[in-house]
């Protein structure tokens, strides 16, 4: 996909890659969401954290970025700061130590808290400028920039 600020390559795992910046963009990972729902009695499957991390690793292998930008909501809730999830996240991060990683804070990040410093993920506020791209969590207008944002989740209504 061509933009005024360079190409973006879209992946089947709902990420985007900027070849010019060697940057991978991913939004709304929501690690720990399934465990949070299960704790509230909602029957959702286990194992989604590892599946999501594996998909991210596939995207990293496919595009070979120098940096990964999380466009908000990396962690779903404070419950994500548990030994099991953080252990998986630390093991995943150890596989990708060569990559710079930045989290643009989203609405869930303010509730969940920043990722532990041991993950070596920088945390910034929106909009974060990368060339002509304004990296955000909440869709918004940024003058003279192309906004890359998350927050708006696809919705399916079942009758």
Q: What residue spans do the PLM features occupy?
A:
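Flexible, charged surface loops at secondary-structure boundaries
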Residues: 17-19, 61-64, 97, 141-143
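Conserved beta-strand elements of the Class I
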Residues: 17, 23-26, 134, 146
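Histidine-centered active-site/metal-ligand motif
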Residues: 13, 30, 108, 137, ...
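Conserved beta-sheet core of the metallophosphoesterase superfamily
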Residues: 124-159
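Zn-dependent metallo-beta-lactamase
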Residues: 1-22
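Core catalytic region of metal-dependent phosphoesterases/phosphodiesterases
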Residues: 24-26, 33-129
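Active-site/binding-pocket entry motifs
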Residues: 31-32, 141
